[in-house]
């Protein structure tokens, strides 16, 4: 099922991130901002986090990809969203939606519905979030749907990928799902097939999680080791871990 996503392919996408150093503009939640920025840097990408509706499109204009995360959506963030959608549409820029807790509020569901109208949209959520969005996604042809958990499932126009890497400690540090969405966006900036881009990002993140778990004593040191493991991931490690 993942025949097109071997270690060489993943390494090639990661090398393109390291070479191009794409900026990912993150309209994200206040909890996950720091860990998201640090994971992007460890991955070789560059974060920008502007929120103000009157500057967000200027700041994002030269970014390689955009992330919209609904986790602590504010009135200001809500006004920034159409600016980013307009920019992504005009420039054909990749946009990833992280529908945090979309099942908890009609406001989030309405915002998700607007964002899902963007052609080529990529959505990454956990099982509950993706289940809540299922009726909307069923009416969204061309979207890439990513459900993370013990096994990550990527349903893309180019096919289905399943990633069985990672570690349960990844659920004990807040914002790692949010950070994974940003890494998917970074790969979308350098790889036109969003299925392969998401597969590379989540394989790298999962393998870094496995390595970090071997080095850590609990969730605190795990977060630190995860940044280090992601920053030093190389093709030889991918080959060994992907088998
Ligand atoms: N039980 C598990 N075993 C291995 N890896 C896991 C497990 N659960 C989650 N992961 C990994 O953790 C990362 C985050 O996924 P998760 O589904 O926990 O996100 P999330 O619920 O959106 O997190 P958050 O909202 O806290 O940011 C993914 O890379 C995923 O593969
Ligand atoms: C804990 C939390 N609350 C809103 S966003 C967030 C980070 C994980 O999604
Ligand atoms: Mg989440």
Please provide the spans of the model-predicted regions.
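Conserved N-terminal subdomain of the carbohydrate kinase-like
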Residues: 2-97
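Charged C-terminal helix
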Residues: 5-8, 207-243
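Short, small-residue alpha-helix embedded
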Residues: 174-207
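Short, well-ordered alpha-helix to beta-strand connector turns
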Residues: 21, 63-64, 119-120, 142-143
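Conserved phosphate-donor
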Residues: 122, 134-172
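Conserved beta-alpha-beta core of the PfkB/ribokinase-like small-molecule kinase fold
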Residues: 56, 65-137, 147
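Glycine/serine-rich anion-binding loops at beta->alpha junctions
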Residues: 28-33, 168-181
